[in-house]
Amino acid sequence: MNKLSINDVDVRDKRVLIRVDFNVPLKNGQISNNQRIAAALPTIKLALEKGAKSVVLMSHLGRPDGRPIHAASMKPVVAELENLLGKKIMFLEDCVGSKVEAACANPEPGSVILLENLRFHVEKEGKGKDAQGNKAKADDAAVAAFRASLSKLGDVYVNDAFGTAHRAHSSMVGVDLPVKACGLLMKKELDYFAKALENPARPFLAILGGAKVADKIQLIENLMDKVNEMIIGGGMAFTFLKVLNNMDIGGSLFDEGAKIVGRLVDKAKEKGVKLHLPSDFITGDKFADVAKSATASVASGIPEGWMGLDVGTKTNEVFQKVIEGAKTIVWNGPPGVFEFENFSTGSKQMMDSVVRATEAGTITIIGGCDTATCAKNSNATEKVSHVSTGSGTSLELLEGKILPGVAALSQP
């Protein structure tokens, strides 16, 4: 994961083409959350401070499926970016082609240029939909031409879009420039995951939640090669408990991943990984915040018509001690249905424990959309070591997969 960084590249008098992630939520044509734009500012500012002739920004927004759609235009980003950067932005009505190439060929020194949505072209991802809504595939020559046009817009390529680094799309792997570096946001992501996956301080603890074992098989198996302890929570804990303890789980989640639970437990024993499963639960009579609640344990089981929606008091106490003893923590998936206030206690208490561990010097990394939201709800985003900006990307990294967008970058 050690890649060339923009910190180590001479960009003076060069055009810097930066792949950013400006895929921001829009409401009535207005940006409702500017977090992703703000996250790219340090890289943009650094390029300008280092004397770049121009900074050319490219991103996707929404899912226009390879066709220009007004509602998915990057235009609303202009005012927000100007406000945050304190600088005039030149907006181009396309992202490739002769007009775009001409505008980017010799711009005023210090220019910041924002391209139109990359996903307005089917060649960006290689597939999309035609005007009639039918599936469309870009031919190889068109993809090559699209990539060649992008490559003419800069002298140095910088990728700061960690959230799409797991996709082998044209803007991630197809820019043909001699220098391809990671931006500051990408570097921070790679550095933190390297701390966990390449040389972790031990004991190394993985906390895994989520609904289905089947969705997390690769994640569990890969992390078992690396961690000392593993907490299994969320809906998938019930699949483990039914298989291992023959627990009555009522209407709780149970999935086809059940058939490999035995294999996963055997691997944990073989690798000396200590598995921690919940021992008690807060249950609900339906999947809703207003559900009636009760308590249950592994021994008592959960009656029919009820389901486990959070972990119980004893489980919280055990998990807290496990977290306190760890020196590196990777957390992907809350232990309960934190979206429902009545079933959020376990997730809140776990977040509090992780924050305290961080304060005591533990490296704590949060990945996955739900866990990141949980951190935000608890005002803990700045209180842990790192909250990843790319849920799909971080999951693939933790699964041991190679990220195409990272593999395409230059070595230092």
UniProtKB/Swiss-Prot annotation:
One of its GO terms (molecular function) is ATP binding. Its EC number is 2.7.2.3. CDP binds at G210, D215, G234, G333, F338. It is found in: Cytoplasm. ADP binds at G210, G234, F338. InterPro entries: Phosphoglycerate_kinase, Phosphoglycerate_kinase_CS, Phosphoglycerate_kinase_N, Phosphoglycerate_kinase_sf. It catalyses: (2R)-3-phosphoglycerate + ATP = (2R)-3-phospho-glyceroyl phosphate + ADP. Gene3D superfamilies: Phosphoglycerate kinase, N-terminal domain. Monomer. This is Phosphoglycerate kinase. The gene is PGK.
